[in-house]
Amino acid sequence: MIEIKGDDRIREVSLKNNKTGDVSQVPAAAVFVFIGQKPQSDFLPPEVIRSLSGHVLTGLDLMREGKRPQGWPLDRDTLLLETSVPGIFAAGDVRNGTKHGVAAASGDGNAAVSMFWQYLSSF
């Protein structure tokens, strides 16, 4: 996107194809800007499994052919937002398969806290 046009509200955006240089005008009533879509997961230990794009795998994304992730030490499946390391949970844009945005991240965070308490209650 190279330009937002309108008077008292957004009416149109100009989009540029970075490969061809072509610019097109698209009618619009709103613009959602997603900045920094690269997940910041480099600080995590290597045992936390990530996708090729760096998104953290959790829950069912870790299951392969109905089996728990390799090295999973517990006698239960991973919780929905639990990573390949028991007790480490991922929420928001860093999680593989998430719907990017504040509302989704907030919901993930709330659910992760609940799952963390569930994890702690097992001790």
Question: How would you describe each model-predicted region?
Answer:
Residues M1-D75, Q118-S122:
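A Rossmann-like FAD-binding core segment of flavoenzymes
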